[in-house]
Amino acid sequence: MMLRRGSDFKRRRSRQTAGARRIARRSGTRGEIEPIVDHLSHPHGDPAFLREAQTALPAGAREQRASPPRPADQFFVAPERAGIADWAKQLRLHQWAKNGLIFLPLFLAHKFTEPHAILWATLGFVVFGCTTSANYIINDLVDLKADRLHPTKRRRPLAAGRISIAEGIVVAVFLMVGGLVGGVLLSPAFAAAMVAYLGLAIAYSFRLKRLALADVFTITTLFTLRIALGTAVIDAKWSPWLLSFSMFFFFSLALAKRNVELIRVFGSGQRTVSGRGYEIDEAPLTTAFGTAAAVGAMIIMLLYITNEAAVSGNYRTPAWLFPIPAMMFLWTLRIWLLSYRGLLNDDPVIFALRDRVSWMLGVVAALGLALAF
């Protein structure tokens, strides 16, 4: 029995020695193999085993035997430092396209020929963009642990480690404070609307996004607040038509995005969308609510053109305004068709910026507006 155990021990030791040789051969330096040898060795181990592992160096590596051991973290590749593209991604500069709604009151109030109004609207766009970028950084810092486990969000600069937590905090504070101070300097009403936006956005991130219908209503309100910001910064007259249209239109788009999430989890065995308050059986309801809201938005626009724009005297040929709701309705129906097919991969507004058909419909609508003047 003792001979058998001794034989087994020698075989195990032989395998360990061979493994140590392979590790030493691959590592190339004594400093790299020493921690591994320490791990494999035993207080009662054969000293020859240690000598084998420490001397099994490849050709050309003997001169490195006296080099000090390297720390374990040097075996890992450090993430690249953030470049301009990383910061642009972290600040979500592509999302600034949504902030273009700030310029909408400038056109509807027919102040687009006034340099002062154009300047203030542009400053408002930049100031508000800084605060929204700060809010995106804060959200990523809060969700950092979850983002690092997410299949796509783990590539975000903060989650990937290309931007450090300290850098994120400093930039977020700088942008937030700078944006709020700039908002106060532009207009107290603009600053108040911006504070309301940030408060609602934070509430959405921490709680409201998990509540069915409350989430899409919050998104709708955030879009409408962008229009309110544009109205406040140029001191234009408030338009109930525009605000009503915005609530119905963006409510429909927000539901379209939720609808595609429901369709994608259908058949996966899940009953609910992760992190949302919807169940897969409610997809027909979201479709009904969303398409009804789209129809309501188009009715409001048609009533505005007929009852206000056509009789305002601001347009020489108001009839050319009617292609605008027609093109918008076609675009909304296209969004819902893609949502039903599960092909709407982006936010509808961001999708429109990348979609060729959306651009074609937009050109027709813009041509109608130009001919109306």
Q: Which sequence ranges carry the predicted segments?
A:
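C-terminal membrane-associated helical module and adjoining short loops/tails
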Residues: 83-86, 93-95, 206, 224-373
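Multi-pass membrane catalytic core of lipid/isoprenoid biosynthesis enzymes
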Residues: 149-194, 240-250, 288-294, 358-373
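Alpha-helical transmembrane segments of multipass membrane proteins
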Residues: 103, 107, 177-181, 199-203, ...
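C-terminal cap/substrate-recognition subdomain and adjoining C-terminal extension
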Residues: 1-108
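Acidic (Asp/Glu-rich) catalytic motifs at the cytosolic membrane interface
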Residues: 40, 131-159, 214, 255-263, ...
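Topogenic membrane-insertion module of multi-pass membrane proteins
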Residues: 71-148, 161-174
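Non-transmembrane, extramembrane segments of multi-pass ion/lipid transporters
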Residues: 55, 64-89, 145-158, 261-275
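Membrane-helix interface "capping/anchor" motifs
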Residues: 206-216
